[in-house]
Amino acid sequence: VTHLIAHILKSAGKKIILGGNIRGVSGLQLLKKIKNAKMAVFELDSWQLQGFGDSKISPCISVFTTFFPDHMGYYKGNIKKYFSDKAHIFKYHKNKDLLIVGKQVLPFIQKWGGKIKSKIVIPKEKLPKSWKFNLPGMHNEYNAMLAVEVARTLCISDKKTRRALESFTSLPGRLQFLRKVNGIKVYNDNSSTTPDATIVALQAVGDVKARKVVLIIGGDNKFLDMSELINEIPKFCSKVVLFKERGTDLIRDKIFSFRNKGIAVYEEEGLKSTVKRAFSIAKRGETILYSPAFFSFGKHFKNEFDRGDQFVKIVKNLR
């Protein structure tokens, strides 16, 4: 959503700064530049929002997209504390400020005990039918609608917004279409580090009637409930390749039990072997989806970005 908003604003000729939880961009480096720009578009995680809470400030326009359990190791399983940090994005709003809320997160906000002073906007679920948007999945279309509401608030015409959205392409690691090899589509969804994110990815590129997804999954333990994802995998997947790691160990037995449902299941050590296995078993017309659902930390990668870079390199070198 952050990149969508930034793309719309830039396309409309606005001078902006993009920062926050963005790869290769240090928020500290941007502080001197912000005064020279008219707008700052920041993606803020719960840790960054802790700082907003310490300073008792919230952005004048806030977009709260979704809320799912994450970072439960750090929060010691306290989902209320996690939401409390996230809530700093709107907690210190004034009457003139704006909170744009995704439909999924609305019940959590309604249960929140604090008073919200700003105006709340809940976008429509779909873009106008005549608009062409290239990213797969209903969640991406809804993300686009969140960005549309920001543009409208800033008096950017729908005509300019439409033109910007129709030129937007997928971001690295976020349901990024890499290539088609021998009739097999390959998607890099490396940024999906939670079970909920992987479920959304399966729904975006999969089909419950066809079951043509070859899923690559696994990583380090994030202390999240994997039960819903385990229930969803058989609906979309013909094959699953497990990437051996500490988190993967927790779901191995249940994933291997899918063999009783006619789903082929394998486990490999190292990303290169895992990807090669997926390509060796995938058939023409199927889709290989790399959506880990776990942390990147462990012995194989420096960080999440390194994991994604390695996957892209391996896929590009395949013949």
How does the language model describe each region?
Residues 55-69, 101, 106-109, 135-170, ...:
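A conserved, hydrophobic alpha-helical segment in the catalytic core
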Residues 93-98, 115-119, 237-238, 260-263:
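A short helix->loop->beta-strand "cap" motif at the edges of active sites that frequently abuts
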Residues 152-157, 163, 167-171, 177-319:
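ATP-dependent carboxylate-amine ligase
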Residues 29-32, 148-153, 203:
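Short glycine/serine- and small hydrophobic-enriched flexible loop segments
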Residues 14-25:
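Short beta-strand-centered segment that lines the nucleotide-binding/catalytic pocket of NTP-utilizing
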Residues 34-115, 124-134, 298-305:
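Flexible active-site lid/hinge loop adjacent to a nucleotide/diphosphate
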Residues 1-15:
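A conserved segment at the C-terminal end of the G1
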Residues 21, 43, 65, 82, ...:
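Residue-level signal for inorganic ion chemistry
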